């Protein structure tokens, strides 16, 4: 379909150039190379101290599960504490409430932003017996807000390729 579109636009170098530029902008957006803005949701999570005085921490696994749910609900861009999540992002829990995302130390409270259809994003997390329900039952404070003006920063590192030539 794209090839046919290029051929049809071939008559005008300006139109072809504009089409290629638009494709490049979209590709950079999906790769996380540009700041993005749009409607979506913000999720706030934080560690808590239980009745026995033990700190209960949000783990990397918790964050990964939420990111996976958001992706499955059609999130077009996601960040955690202003760290853009891309296909090469690592979310690693090292203990004592310390999580590394994109090799940056991130501490609780966590703010997860997702751009996409607010209804889908919110409903996948809030469904009866959903992951947010489970976190709340344990005692975690979880807040989800809808917004028409979510901003997610670009991925700050170079996208490195070891094997692609």
Sequence positions of predicted segments:
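Membrane-proximal structural modules of membrane-associated proteins and complexes
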Residues: 36, 40, 50-164
């Amino acid at each position: 379909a794209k090839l046919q579109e290029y051929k049809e636009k071939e008559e005008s170098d300006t139109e072809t150039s504009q089409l290629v530029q638009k494709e490049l902008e979209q590709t950079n957006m999906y790769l996380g190379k540009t700041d993005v803005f749009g409607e979506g949701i913000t999720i706030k999570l934080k560690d808590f101290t239980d009745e026995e005085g033990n700190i209960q921490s949000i783990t990397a696994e918790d964050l990964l599960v939420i990111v996976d749910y958001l992706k499955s609900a059609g999130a077009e861009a996601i960040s955690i504490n202003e760290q853009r999540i891309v296909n090469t992002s690592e979310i690693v829990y090292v203990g004592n409430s310390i999580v590394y995302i994109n090799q940056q130390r991130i501490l609780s409270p966590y703010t997860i932003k997702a751009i996409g259809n607010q209804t889908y994003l919110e409903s996948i997390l809030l469904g009866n017996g959903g992951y947010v329900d489970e976190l709340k039952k344990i005692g975690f404070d979880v807040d989800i807000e809808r917004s028409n003006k979510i901003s997610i920063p670009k991925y700050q590192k170079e996208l490195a390729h070891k094997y692609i030539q």
